[in-house]
A protein has these predicted regions:
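Active-site beta->alpha loop and helix N-cap motifs at the rims of alpha/beta catalytic domains
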Residues: 1-16
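Short loop-to-alpha-helix "cap/lid" segments that border enzyme active sites
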Residues: 11, 22-139
Length: 139
């Protein structure tokens, strides 16, 4: 499995891997390539402990936990659960043009990952919402 990841990395000429599953820190480190570890954040989760388990991560993507859904649900989570991190934070989950500025001000993430919050309907982006989102991020 480690060799499969390495080979895919080489073939696709990737710069970074983003792990969204139950990969252990040992597995991520054994691959030996730069990576972002994603966590689906839920109430009561000890996110500090989870982040600390991955000292070699290049960053962390934090999204809302929704049972039975891998992500992209449009659901948010309590940003107060986000601890300081040794690596950059990418914030996802329930982001919209109306809360993008608050997300930046409160969390100070390296990046925002938005999907459903700028859609007209599932899978269809709204150019106006996208422009409003970008304006909120810049101002």
């Amino acid at each position: 499995e480690v060799e499969t990841v390495k080979r895919t990395f080489e073939i696709a000429r990737l710069n970074l891997i983003q792990y969204h599953g139950d990969e252990s820190p040992e597995f991520c480190d054994a691959v030996g390539l730069p990576y972002i570890k994603a966590f689906r954040v839920q109430k009561g989760m000890n996110l500090r402990s989870e982040i600390d388990r991955y000292p070699n991560a290049s960053g962390f993507l934090l999204d809302a936990y929704v049972k039975g859904q891998p992500g992209g649900t449009g659901e948010g989570f309590d940003w107060e659960l986000i601890p300081q991190s040794h690596a950059p934070i990418i914030l996802a989950g329930g982001l919209t043009p109306d809360n993008a500025r608050a997300a930046i001000d409160q969390v100070a993430p390296w990046a925002l990952d938005v999907s459903g919050g700028i859609e007209i309907k599932p899978g269809r982006k709204d150019p106006d919402k996208m422009a409003r989102f970008m304006d909120a991020c810049r101002n």
